[in-house]
């Protein structure tokens, strides 16, 4: 007897739901799945160059690139790598990450990270991005400010007035000529663990645009008072600054100039490291203004190796297996098979890798499509033959290069 696709997923595939994203876009949701084992070398390289480079190498900036021979430079996992590195840091104020990078125990420092991204709607400049980073620190799954407040309150002997004074003293120590700490921000933080997040949620879009740097500066003062020595800011979608029509040429130059300001003035110069995502289109659009402001080079040439990490996508089938398993494992039920990629069979891995050109985001989207197709067809397992038939019928395989090393040879006949 035929069942609906979702019942088939539950009972035949052993999955409570389709775990894969229905769009090839990183959502940033707390439930987004991640495994360091998908890109172990790139993950280690990124954290080494950004974190250890920021702590011990004197680096203030770093760049996470994606590149592919086809010229398709999105969907490689830059956003996910940044987000999950920030989460790994904030889990224990960077202790485990630093230990894994080989930093000696005596040199491990308390650090935090924030993630924020530009967009073409409300964050098309640096200040609203800094505001979003402050929100990232204050609320949600990556929040550190509630724990920071508890630490400061303990140091102040549960005296809120003393905690207030400690934060003000921190400002005078690290940036005596810097921006003043906003009183509304300080009051909200001192008042309760959730006070800062609640305050920030009510700030108008206009104020975020004008005053985002003030809120972020205040966060740095608060973190410094608690003994945090470095903040790692991960900025995604920098290419939106250079998109045609997003900003006028004058405004784009101003926004890029603000990045330079943050490398030179306190409290940012000594307490902040910024990482940016890049690809070829972003580099072309931003190069002129970037160079005019004499910002650190984002070039991928060997001379700049200490500041640049390049993601080149999924190169091996074991990476595809690890990626699929990371997403499926949380939703497996008592009907699940013993294979880590069940209901897929191993010959599907190469097909998905070739079809996506190694781009993790695209691969997960195609896996979602294929899983639903298998459930709709009521198959017991999803093998290579089913995958080839499905994708050929939708015209996807025609775009895959026949020379792809492993999977391409299996279905050259479909590429004619």
Per-segment meaning from a language model:
Residues 4, 317-416:
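C-terminal alpha-helical "lid" subdomain
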Residues 8, 129, 147, 151, ...:
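Charge-rich, solvent-exposed alpha-helical interaction surfaces
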């Amino acid at each position: 007897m035929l069942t609906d696709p979702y019942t088939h997923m539950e009972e035949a595939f052993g999955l409570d739901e389709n775990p894969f994203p229905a769009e090839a876009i990183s959502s940033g949701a707390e439930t987004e799945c991640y495994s360091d084992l998908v890109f172990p070398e790139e993950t280690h390289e990124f954290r080494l160059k950004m974190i250890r480079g920021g702590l011990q190498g004197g680096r203030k900036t770093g760049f996470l690139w994606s590149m592919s021979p086809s010229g398709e430079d999105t969907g490689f996992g830059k956003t996910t790598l940044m987000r999950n590195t920030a989460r790994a840091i904030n889990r224990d104020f960077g202790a485990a990450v630093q230990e894994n990078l080989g930093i000696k125990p005596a040199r491990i420092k308390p650090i935090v990270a924030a993630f924020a991204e530009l967009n073409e709607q409300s964050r098309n400049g640096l200040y609203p991005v800094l505001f979003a980073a402050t929100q990232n620190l204050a609320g949600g799954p990556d929040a550190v400010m509630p724990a920071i407040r508890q630490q400061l309150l303990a140091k102040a002997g549960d005296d809120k007035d003393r905690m207030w004074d400690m934060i003000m003293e921190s400002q005078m120590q690290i940036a005596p000529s810097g921006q003043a700490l906003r009183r509304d921000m300080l009051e909200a933080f001192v008042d309760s663990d959730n006070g800062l997040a609640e305050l920030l949620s009510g700030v108008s879009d206009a104020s975020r645009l004008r005053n985002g740097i003030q809120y972020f500066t205040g966060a740095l003062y608060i973190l410094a008072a608690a003994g945090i020595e470095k903040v790692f800011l991960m900025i995604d979608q920098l290419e939106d600054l250079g998109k045609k029509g997003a900003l006028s040429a004058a405004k784009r130059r101003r926004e890029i100039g603000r990045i330079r300001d943050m490398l030179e003035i306190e409290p940012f110069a000594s307490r902040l490291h910024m990482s940016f995502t890049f690809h070829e289109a972003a580099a072309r659009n931003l190069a002129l203004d970037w160079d005019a402001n004499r910002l650190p080079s984002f070039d991928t040439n060997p001379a700049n190796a200490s500041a640049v990490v390049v993601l080149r996508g999924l190169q091996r089938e074991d990476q595809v297996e690890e990626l699929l398993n990371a997403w499926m494992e949380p939703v497996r039920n008592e009907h699940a098979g013993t294979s880590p990629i069940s209901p897929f069979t191993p010959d599907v891995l190469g097909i998905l890798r070739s079809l996506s050109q190694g781009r993790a985001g695209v691969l997960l989207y195609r896996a979602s499509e294929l899983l639903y197709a298998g459930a709709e067809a009521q198959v017991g397992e999803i093998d290579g033959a089913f995958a080839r038939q499905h994708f050929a019928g939708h015209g996807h395989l025609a775009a895959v290069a026949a020379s792809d090393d492993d999977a391409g040879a299996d279905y050259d006949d479909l590429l004619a």
